[in-house]
Amino acid sequence: ASEVFEVDGMMALRDLFQIVGINRPDLHDPSHHPLDHPKLSDKRSIFHIIREIGPILLQHPYESFATSVERFLLEASFDPKVLAIKMTLYRTSEDSKIIDYLVDAAQNGKQVTVVVELKARFDEAANIRWANRLEEAGIHVTYGVLGLKTHSKVILVVRRDYNGLRRYAHIGTGNYHAGTARLYSDLGLLTCDPAIGEDLTELFNYLTTGYVPKRLYRKLLPAPKVLKPALLAKIERESEHAKAGRPARIQFKMNALEDKDITAALYRAS
């Protein structure tokens, strides 16, 4: 009871969406239009940009989903040097360009694999339709590991560069859904980091075959086996830094916090 407190005002801020729907343009702020990421304003191949500039952090909805993530997949589907595309699909929009680009890629001779989560809440029927369309296009569709829900949002592109094969990746916190990308606050990363590419290769092998990876992940922390122990270890590390008088900081961005062990660790750290 000592940890329960009252606040003045609303708790369910989502109810304010009803006010936004009122037809009073004179009371509305100007519409927000996502900006192109400054590093992606270059019209060269997005793969050249990622290779030369390095990892690109995306912040949606402030930065455009269309000119970053959708562009990444669009160019991958038509680039003659791209050999393969692998992707997880949890939720997408009815008028999804993502699906179109995957179909285009298959028709252009790329090897395309999509892991579709059929138990995505409220979108089960839609995902079955998407899976059928992808399979009809000749795309290899799998449905994840039995007993687990595939909630990760990742794309892996294998491209033949001037010096050999290179893996390009997108890792995001939000769905590949153009509509919610204009509303929800999410982060994404475009990168060709070799370690991340190798980790994603292992992850897709696991998601498509069920075989446990033969090596440890170097940079990714996939749930359910790796993420929680790693977070607890990192929280403890920062606690030890603080005790020793060294700089220490913990910053989390999350949709919700429900795990009791993580919560307890954060209390101890604070």
Show the residue positions of the predicted features.
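N-terminal localization/anchoring segments of enzymes in phospholipid and broader phosphate metabolism
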Residues: 1-250, 257-259, 267-268
